[in-house]
Amino acid sequence: MKTLYVYADFDWLDEPMLVGELGYESLRGSDSYSFKYDNDWLRQYGSLYLSADINNYPGQQYTQPDRDIFGCFNDALPERWGRLLLNRREQILATEEKRPVRKLSSFDYLIGIDDYSRMGGFRFKEKQDGEYINCEKSLRIPPLTDIRALVAASMEIEKSEELNQLPEKKWLLQLVHPGTSLGGARPKAGVMNDEGRICVAKFPSRNDDYDVGLWEHLSHLLAKEAGVEAAETSVIETGKKYHALLSKRFDRTVEGRRKHFASAMTLLGLTDGCDAKSGNGYLDIVDFILQNCCDVEQNLRQLYRRVAFNIAIGNSDDHFRNHGFLLTPRGWTLSPAYDMNPTLNEYQALLINSTTNYADLQVLLDSSEEYMIGKDEAVYIIEEVKAGVKHWKSIATRLGIAKREMDVYEQVFQRSLK
């Protein structure tokens, strides 16, 4: 049994506090996890809801047989891109050390991530009187000036994947620490901007046929025009055909303190693949807001506005990982919106109401009462969103988005703004 001591280093705590112990065991290829709250944490903060699969009571708790690591820790894990980097590093090390390649578990991914850039407010120790794991200054994330080298390294990694070859170690070493703490499938890394703020840098892919980063930046600009609280973004030239997107980390304060983040997937107790096909949707998030959020009315209105915006720009990749919350002493509140980009799909990933995921603002208007929103207010919100989005083409032109790309997505905006 391996054990990690879990600490909350939340921005509203005077100092980091022990939350509990995370245990991991692998028997005959099957991974199991346990968690035990610290009594002092339960005494002071036992009313806070951290994860749908961990109850607020003393004693050992275990993951379900068909589940991986507890949801609240899963949010700190890398997804496809970060796991690719860690898996390829393990293959290279195994070759150098002349040993079999280990199959990495979620526990391995968790302890392999740089402490400084890990998402959210949890930190981990192997001994209570020891240092936090992976907090060495040598692992600090690179400056923005390294962006071109990081993009070049990510493209070399992609190239080696296409050729079914191991990448050169030098490319991995550039990316493995800044690039493994982040979710998502696309190439990315953490970088430090000129203000000393940590940002997510999303790189263009070798396989892109349009400027994905520039369109995501446009989406965030439009979101703010539409009254959606969204992550702050910018774009930077990479020396390649397309731009990199920079998104300021909203789980960090200006002073660098950690805000605790959890995805809607974690807080609702769901897994990847839970979406409209499984009968899940935005009303599940409504239920969570009613039960566990502070400023309930404000969060409900903001959620409704975000659904309207997603429909308006065709952002159909709106699954539960792409909705999140930040923890305050009074409960959860919606995090700034993130990962928004137009698509040509006419259906959202999540159900808009109890029956359909068809992306139509009239469907959303007719469903306003399911969001606890009155009809008049719903009309007002939707009209504000449409007003914020209607000048999309002039903003896209100002950003330098190619006309051929605008022609592709014009049908999406025309459909929602009719």
Walk through the language-model features, giving the residues of each.
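Phosphate/dinucleotide-binding and metal-coordinating scaffold of catalytic cores
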Residues: M1-F320, G324-K418
